[in-house]
Amino acid sequence: MNHLLTIDPSVIDWSRAQFALTAIYHWLFVPLTLGLAVVMGIIETIYYRTGKPFWREAARFWQRLFGVNFAMGVATGIILEFEFGTNWSNYSWFVGDIFGAPLAVEGIVAFFMESTFVAVMFFGWDKVSRGFHLASTWLTGLGATISAWWILVANAWMQYPVGCEFNPDTVRNEMVSFADVALSPFAIDKFFHTVTSSWLVGAVFVCAVSCWFLLRNREKRLAVESIKIAAIVGLVSSLLAMMTGDFSAVKVAKTQPMKLAAMEALYNGGEGVGLTVVAAINPFAQPDYANEKEPPLHLAMPKGLSLLATHSLDGYVPGVNDLLNGYTRPDGKRELSAEEKMERGRRAIASLAEYRTLRAKDANNPKLKELATQLKEDMPYFGYGYIKDRAELVPYIPINFYAFRVMVGVGTLLLLFFIVIGHVAWRMNISRRRTWLYLTALAMLPLVYVASEAGWIVAELGRQPWAIQDMMPTMAAVSDLRSGSVALTFFLFLILFTVLLIAEVRIMCHVIKNYKSPASATE
């Protein structure tokens, strides 16, 4: 990490911007892939059980839309993975043995599984048995879900690094337990929350397209039956997303308390802390954490944050100042202040430098063991050694605060939406002209994407300044590049990904507008 002494700070900013750009675009495609896979799998299952041509054609319609989206997700995902080697080479060197393992499994197992069965799903109609085709459809969705699992395992490890040990001889973190990495509680919660929220995206998409048909007085049976299925999927996934989100909040409170404090704009913690519902935060104000007060127009749910973070009404939740100044936990353990962690981090860096210098001269020097022991004690704070000002440890509060509320607010709205549209679809005649409901469904489509992206903004920006929590700050992970080169590729990716997004929207709109049920699909 010696290049940190000369690296241009703008390289860090451009590299972060490029990764954010590609990740946001990629995530426009992934949740729809996971969500549509469930809906079209259910529809084809009904066809398998009934043998009615209508269900066959319904499955094929949704599979066409799935195929377009699936292709775009693969294209944008490959570019995203390559960025670790180009823009974040120091990160790849430092933890490549660990981070690369789940991505390798994802590529070998999940991606090959998807590639194989997606071909059967699209081209196997009338060429393979109904049962084998149905299995291929479900296995395509399962492959995409397994792919998401391994990618989320890698991301969860960045949030909560486990199953590894630092080797001072190679200056790398090495995996000591694949099971700890793959089955991390943080990874499990992240996976289920991400997948269930993706099912939500798929359900909203199906409802929106179906309501467009009803608004145009077309394909009524396809629209009605699709809404019935999507409403159930959406209602179940809404409840599951809320439940898994609660589990994730508890994990964040334990492992990333600064992220939670930023999400709540909580400067001074305590017991029985309220959950802020509405507040006004000035995004342009220079933060003064020691003197920060509750934001104006502050409306909070009494003891709500303590309940969310600790599952206790009187649970203790630390604020920004508590985390910067150090505090005593309810169990009596003292948490170090930011300055103490930074000092131990600098000591770890100094011990590592001395260890490598001595080892280069004499690999049998008895002092090496002493330095290795000292380094192991200070290694949990290694990343803090690169922090110059404790204010750097606080994520940007306004964007985390509002993004979290957008995610939760839209999620709650979607739950109500699925209750209403499900009731109308199953208990009433939804094909009877209900313009207000059709327009509401169309409005929900952009909202669910905003909520989905907002969740990832909280997950990633709330972790800053860390690339790997407490272990490696973002500025230490970047490659030593010219800022102009990174800026150029940023705009190239912006153009490329925008073209891909426009292409997907145009192709999907073409498929939807020109779809006409064949005469054989009346039964």
Predicted regions and their residues:
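Membrane-interface helix-loop-helix modules in multi-pass inner-membrane proteins
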Residues: 69-139, 156, 461-465
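Aromatic-rich transmembrane-lumenal/periplasmic boundary elements in polytopic membrane proteins
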Residues: 154, 236-347
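Membrane-interface interhelical loops and short amphipathic "cap" helices
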Residues: 1-24, 51-58, 82-104, 156-192, ...
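Membrane-interfacial loop-to-helix junctions in multi-pass inner-membrane proteins
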Residues: 50-68, 94-100, 104, 124-142, ...
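Internal alpha-helical transmembrane segments
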Residues: 119-127, 132-141, 149-157, 178, ...
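Hydrophobic alpha-helical transmembrane segments
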Residues: 30-39, 109-117, 198-209, 406-422, ...
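C-terminal substrate/ligand-recognition segments
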Residues: 388, 392-456, 487-511
